[in-house]
Amino acid sequence: MRTKYIDLISQTYEFPQEEFHVEDNELYYNGIPLMDIIKQYGTPLKITYLPRISQNIQRARRWFNVAIARADYQGDYHYCYCTKSSHFEFVLTEVLKNGVHIETSSAFDINLIEILHENGQFNKDNYIICNGFKKQQYIDNIAQLVSNGYTNVIPILDNMAEYDQLNKAINDPCQIGIRIAAEEEPRFEFYTSRLGIRYNDIIPFYESTIKQNPKFKLKMLHFFINTGINDTAYYWNELSKCVSIYCDLKKICPDLDSLNIGGGFPIKNRLSFNYDYEYMTEEIVSQIKQICDREGVMEPHIFTEFGSYTVGEASAVLFSILQQERQNDRELWNMIDSSFMTTLPDSWAINQQFIILAVNNWDREYERVFLGGLTCDSHDYYNSEANLNAVFMPKITECNSVTDEEPDSKEQDVQYIGLF
């Protein structure tokens, strides 16, 4: 009877996988022996595998470029990275190696762009898509970029009042965009996005303001779907509505030539993850082209804003199991050497699921456990509804957890886990 942890994983999922394989009962992540990393640096530890960032960027580029070629689509594709997903210098350095553009969300992001330009990592003709609600400092920083010769700064109007603020702050010619207030998913708490301008107001607003102002050119129409790019009736309906608005606006605004399809690709958060990126990309391009052809409008350049997709599959967080506690005959707790609330807040705040795997002891029998954090807060545990809050891990023995009473425990005697 196969009751080992490695048997459970290999029989439940297709395993090994692209990112994961096991040698000598220890987990390798993208070819990296995680136990060697733990022995050198200890836990808790977060690592980033930078090549995965470039790999995902190049994959998305390839999918869109192939889809554009197959559909005989006349527009271009532009990949934008959302800085809010990770501001770390080493992440931005890796991202910008791929010649991508930047999407910003705050005044702070503008300061980062200026530093990146000073370091020779960002060109002044790269696109800078300025999203988010804009406080005055953000407005002023955008205006400073324009006056400093950044030629493709595109502030996206999230409300009508921002137009007057930008008009006062910016003195030089500038491209501009409008965000559509998309309808939210039916099960969401609200009907319409809090950001953006309503469908029915966009054309009247353009004609009464931007059209009359020679300083601004309406370059881009932007919509954002909270659920991301998914094969659902809701997503395709919102895409269709937004492209139709684009066509109506293009007929009276010749400068308009770009559609920003906000909301990113999903990322791999479970070993059974299955998503057809190529199909979705081809469908997006095909549907935009079909609607534009029907309306007699030239296809727009396509911009995407990928944050989580860019960096979400490139990180691992490694923990030690400090102690095991049995509270009753059904609940067995493995206590990690950190806090989920501070280290992985998405796991408890929005029930974000992660791939959880043992780093060592794959030859041991497995058991069902709950993962708990160090703090006294009752919510400090791995709280993924998709996993029913419990995971399976190699059985803990008396010598493979570490406590204050066992300061000299060797690494091979301690159970380590990774969240990816």
Question: At which residue positions do the language-model features occur?
Answer:
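A charged N-terminal "starter" segment
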Residues: M1-C174, I178, E207, K211-K217, ...
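Active-site loop/helix belt of alpha/beta enzymes
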Residues: M1-S10, A169-P173, A182-R330
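General structural feature for long, well-ordered alpha-helical segments within catalytic domains
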Residues: P33, Y49-R52, N56, A60, ...
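Solvent-exposed alpha-helices and their adjacent loops that cap or buttress functional pockets
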Residues: Q121-F122, S147-G149, A169-N171, R187, ...
